[in-house]
Amino acid sequence: MIAKTTNLNLFYGKKQALFDINMQIEQNKITALIGASGCGKSTFLRCFNRMNDKIAKIDGLVEIKGKDVKNQDVVALRKNVGMVFQQPNVFVKSIYENISYAPKLHGMIKNKDEEEALVVDCLQKVGLFEEVKDKLKQNALALSGGQQQRLCIARALAIKPKLLLLDEPTSALDPISSGVIEELLKELSHNLSMIMVTHNMQQGKRVADYTAFFHLGELIEFGESKEFFENPKQEKTKAYLSGAFG
């Protein structure tokens, strides 16, 4: 187990957005969060790196590697908990600098050789190196949308996170680019724990080891993806998977 939440409740002012969420996130597995828009998926995801701190009141416990995230320095926390957003958000810097910036900031690189090796390694992990090896000094904004999103994943990997959060990482991409990202995530999960929000149920079925269904801020059902999709236990889950609402 890499992380867990215990009796997690979240409030935006007087409105409660999450209700008593209890969940365990397994090590080196992909956990998908599904549910209709506004059900609390992204809100839940952002509890792990404290991105809700300034806008919400949070009760309950969120732990990563047995440590309460509330008691951790937020910069140190976000080094260990990477995040990839819905829209690619590359830095307005070179492809090379997009990878090297954060490791240098955190003092993880001792010399130029280490820096270059890290950049190459991260780009290779996301299958991007061969596509960009001759243009590492070019602005990352020149890349296609799919390439930019893979660069964002490589950038997140550069600081060696324990947990990677992905908020609909393929929703802004074409089907081919989405497929590339899905295969990449499955490969990365051999050595990395991930939580992924997705509106695409079939994507969750293809990619995730575990799936959680949220409805109106409540965790309705959670389990191994094969069993979850083939034999859902809760009536609301069955209705959602059948397309009765969403």
Curated annotation (Swiss-Prot):
UniProt cross-references to CDD domains, sorted A to Z: ABC_PstB_phosphate_transporter
UniProt keywords, alphabetically: ATP-binding, Cell inner membrane, Cell membrane, Membrane, Nucleotide-binding, Phosphate transport, Translocase, Transport
Enzyme class: translocase
Catalytic function, reaction form: phosphate(out) + ATP + H2O = ADP + 2 phosphate(in) + H(+)
E.C. numbers: 7.3.2.1
Topology of this chain in the membrane: Peripheral membrane protein
GO cellular component, one term: plasma membrane
UniProt GO molecular function: ATP binding; ATP hydrolysis activity; ATPase-coupled phosphate ion transmembrane transporter activity
Domain of life: Bacteria
Coiled-coil residue spans: none
Binding of ATP, residues: 35-42
Subcellular location: Cell inner membrane
One Gene Ontology term from the biological process aspect of the record: phosphate ion transmembrane transport
UniProt KW Transferase keyword: no
Domain ABC transporter: 3-241
Functional summary from the UniProt entry: Part of the ABC transporter complex PstSACB involved in phosphate import. Responsible for energy coupling to the transport system.
Family according to the record: Belongs to the ABC transporter superfamily. Phosphate importer (TC 3.A.1.7) family.
Protein name as it appears in the record: Phosphate import ATP-binding protein PstB
Gene: pstB
